[in-house]
């Protein structure tokens, strides 16, 4: 076990507990922020430990519904996916999902990862998780102040996918 892993996992979980207990957020983002600050390689390491690999999905609409249906199908097929079902679809949310779905030694309690990702954060997720399967949904003009035009987002997706 990497020395930074235990403090990152423990203190990340503690941050989530305090966030929920004190009513400061829902505990879906802050734990991941803390864990990644303490161990920047946490997500990539835990993704690599998933026997069946990672499935990433992104798009403007339908991510949560599709991810939940796919999670049910995977479970019916005998898989044990780690899934960010709370809808926290930035890397911090993926890190938080791993915090609660891994033991304090950093061993995931699942055989696969199923992560819905925000359109702008998808390229980073590809780099960190090295997915075996990618599902791309529709792409519409959404949050232009943050993402720019559809062509910009699509170009970033293409660059990320070419690295696989």
Where in this protein do the model-derived segments appear?
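Phosphate-binding loop of NTP-binding sites
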Residues: 3-164
